Regions:
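A short, small-residue-rich loop immediately preceding and capping a beta-strand
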Residues: 60-96, 218
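Short glycine/serine/threonine-rich phosphate/pyrophosphate-binding segments
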Residues: 8-10, 30-33, 50, 73-80, ...
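ATP/NTP phosphate-donor binding region
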Residues: 1-65, 281
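Short, amphipathic C-terminal "tail helix"
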Residues: 289-324
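Glycine-rich phosphate/diphosphate-binding loops and the adjacent beta-loop-alpha structural elements
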Residues: 155-209, 220-223
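Gly/Pro-rich interdomain helix-loop hinge
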Residues: 225-290
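A glycine/threonine-rich phosphate-anchoring loop and its flanking beta-alpha core
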Residues: 80-164, 171-172, 248, 252-255
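Glycine-rich phosphate/pyrophosphate-binding beta-alpha loops
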Residues: 98, 201-234, 301-305
Length: 324
């Protein structure tokens, strides 16, 4: 995979990869980036509904590559199409989601209100351009950055952790903890936007190298059921997941706290979430009477199985209730 900084390097990257007839996979917001010569699919929707993947796959006929411009939903849509078509993907992320680093993706079944997963996408390149994040709304900046922080935290203690992922996770957590308050205070500060994007890059690499844990499993189950923003859900779910894992992952959480320049990682994560405007699931629109069903869905997810501490349905229900 080739990584470049600066959108000016984009054309050369496509040429290097031999992509001449790309499909631009995005939302209407990003259709005016000077890529008008690309075939366009601008029907990306949150949580990647299955019918969106079908439509994007049809649009890709005759193309020799996919260019995803946007956040996790745009990138996951392109990855789902890549698996169906074999086409390579170039990602131009405009949020801090980290989706550009992994071959896996989620697709939502809207009728059943569940989100499933897949893998095997061909990620060929990434282009980071901090200026594309300047217009990102405050809530989306905070939510996607806290999603990236969750990638860092979980990479340190999940079943698939390793030394290289640890290094990426600690670098990412430190950068995010320093930069996020600055970005939330002034979203037009390009220097801190770049620092936050660098933190998200490290977080994505940590995610790719290690995998996800319980906090993400909770957010995924909630997102699939209610169609709520993935970043906001991770912001709320990460602190209780860290607390739950403290008895078995104390050393990892101490390293996380040191990277974040704090004495307590869970408290700092909750403070950052509160600063970004995320504190309670009910404030996001999650109904209390569905928490039992959500807990049952959480324990079936891969992140729960990879978590260092076994979590029962009752455990998860208690965690969800603590932040409802």
């Amino acid at each position: 995979m080739i990584v470049r900084w600066d959108l000016n390097s984009y054309a050369a990257l496509l040429a290097e990869l031999g992509i001449r007839r790309p499909l631009l996979v995005t939302t209407p917001r990003w259709t005016r980036l000077g890529l008008e010569d690309h075939r366009l699919f601008d029907g990306v929707r949150p949580h990647v509904p299955a019918d969106t993947v079908e439509a994007a796959t049809a649009a890709a006929r005759g193309c020799d590559g996919l260019v995803a411009v946007g956040g996790g939903s745009a990138i996951d849509t392109a990855k789902a199409v890549s698996v169906r078509t074999g086409l390579p993907v170039v990602c131009v992320p405009t949020t801090y989601s980290g989706a550009e680093w992994t071959p896996s993706f989620g697709v939502r079944d809207e009728q059943r209100r569940v989100k499933g997963g897949g893998g095997g996408a061909r990620i060929a390149g990434i282009v980071y351009e901090p200026e594309l994040t300047l217009s990102l709304p405050r809530a989306e900046s905070g939510g996607t950055a806290l999603n990236a922080l969750a990638h860092c935290a979980e990479a340190l203690y999940v079943e698939g952790r390793n030394d290289e992922a640890d290094r990426e996770a600690l670098a990412g957590a430190g950068a995010i903890a320093r930069a996020l308050p600055r970005v939330l205070a002034d979203g037009r500060d390009l220097e801190w936007r770049r620092a936050l994007l660098e933190g998200a890059m490290h977080a994505g690499a940590a995610l790719a190298g290690a995998g996800l844990g319980l906090g993400h499993a909770m957010a995924q189950a909630l997102g699939g059921r209610f169609g709520l923003p993935h970043g906001a859900l991770n912001a709320v779910c990460l602190p209780p997941a860290l607390r739950f894992n403290e008895p078995v992952a104390a050393a990892a959480l101490e390293r996380l706290a040191q990277a974040m320049e704090t004495d307590d990682a869970a408290t700092r994560a909750a403070d950052l979430a509160r600063l970004a405007g995320f504190e309670r699931l009910r404030e996001l629109g999650v109904p209390e009477d569905e928490l039992d069903a959500v807990a049952e869905a959480v324990v079936l997810r891969p992140g729960t199985r990879a978590n260092p501490r076994r979590a029962s349905v009752a455990d998860v229900r208690e965690l969800l209730g603590s932040v409802w």
